[in-house]
Amino acid sequence: MASVAESSGVVEVIELISDGGNDLPRKIMSGRHGGICPRILMPCKTDDDCMLDCRCLSNGYCG
């Protein structure tokens, strides 16, 4: 199940993921480049510290 909202070139998708017993909502941000990056506040120093198609932003967090 997914819900989609679009504003200013960014598409947000809220999916239900399962951890084995509970379904948990997960927000993913899909930008203009087509990549998918979970919207989780995650500190980083390099792009390698980030998940999936995220990159390390100048504020020190993945996005």
From Swiss-Prot:
Record propeptide residues: 22-34
Predominant subcellular localization, coarse grouping: secreted
Translocase in keyword set: no
Site feature Reactive bond, where: 39-40
Signal peptide positions on this chain: 1-21
Localization (cell): Secreted
UniProt key word Cell inner membrane: no
GO molecular function, one term: serine-type endopeptidase inhibitor activity
Coiled-coil annotated residue ranges, if any: none
CDD domains in the cross-refs: PlantTI
CC per GO annotation: extracellular region
Keywords linked to the UniProt accession: Disulfide bond, Knottin, Protease inhibitor, Secreted, Serine protease inhibitor, Signal
Disulfide cysteine pairs (residue numbers): 37-54, 44-56, 50-62
Free-text note on domains in this protein's UniProt record: The presence of a 'disulfide through disulfide knot' structurally defines this protein as a knottin.
Family in the record: Belongs to the protease inhibitor I7 (squash-type serine protease inhibitor) family.
Function: Inhibits trypsin.
Name of the protein in question: Trypsin inhibitor 5
